[in-house]
Design a protein with these regions (language model features):
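Active-site segment of SDR-like NAD(P)-dependent oxidoreductases
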Residues: 73, 106-111, 145-148
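NAD(P)H-binding glycine-rich loop region in Rossmannoid oxidoreductase-like domains
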Residues: 47-88, 111-112
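Structural signature of the Rossmann-like NAD(P)-dependent dehydrogenase/reductase core
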Residues: 5, 68, 100-103, 140-146, ...
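N-terminal Rossmann-fold cofactor-binding loop
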Residues: 29-33
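Conserved Rossmann-fold NAD(P)-dependent oxidoreductase catalytic core, especially the SDR/UDP-sugar
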Residues: 84-120, 140
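NAD(P)-dependent short-chain dehydrogenase/reductase
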Residues: 118, 122, 126-179
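N-terminal Rossmann NAD(P)H-binding glycine-rich loop of SDR-like oxidoreductase domains
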Residues: 2-23
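A generic structural motif
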Residues: 21-27, 137
Length: 180
């Protein structure tokens, strides 16, 4: 089976790929820490800069499954670009032979308190559902706890530990209305 891993792939390791996708041809987009290993059928490359490049990848590999790791898996992660990248991947999934799409996201989608972040997460999940309804994609949404890593540079705790290591001080900002 040909599998594409895209989105917030900084948490994906070679060991994870071997365990989760044995005997599959796997392409990981956007993770600089994973190296291509042809004998294991693992291909790693940067996320395409243009839609034409992304289209070429989908036409060349004809993925049977796509796993999209949301930026919302990272505590206090980067939110910009999530909807656009998700839309691009879904567009090519609907055009190709792809049969399964798994959207792995953080826990915010189940919260009832409307905040900017919960609204964005719920909208991303709705986009997945709409593509499933409109184009017959087989979409699953998996909500998981936040992911943490001591090596992924965009990770919340990695940044805290690096700051601590460099300045020997930790600073946690509180909301102004919070009382001591």
């Amino acid at each position: 089976m040909k599998v594409l891993l895209a989105g917030n792939t900084g948490y994906v390791t070679e060991e994870f790929v071997e365990e989760a996708f044995p005997e599959c041809q796997v392409m990981v987009l956007g993770n600089k820490m994973i190296k291509t290993v042809r004998r294991r059928e693992l291909i790693s490359r940067p996320f395409p800069r243009t839609e034409l490049e992304l289209g070429d990848i989908f036409r060349t590999y004809e993925f049977e499954a796509v796993v999209y790791f949301s930026n919302y898996l990272t505590l206090h992660g980067e939110l910009e670009g999530e909807a656009e990248n998700l839309r691009k991947i879904l567009q090519y999934c609907r055009k190709g032979v792809q049969s399964h799409f798994l959207y792995v996201t953080g826990p915010e989608g189940m919260y009832d308190v409307p905040t900017g972040k919960t609204l964005l997460v719920q909208n991303a999940e709705d986009v997945c559902r709409r593509y499933a309804g409109l184009y017959g994609l087989k979409v699953k949404i998996l909500r998981v706890p936040y992911l943490y890593s001591g090596t992924y540079k965009k990770d919340f705790f990695y940044r805290i530990f690096q700051a601590s290591k460099e300045s020997q001080k930790l600073f946690f900002q509180e909301a102004p209305e919070q009382k001591a």
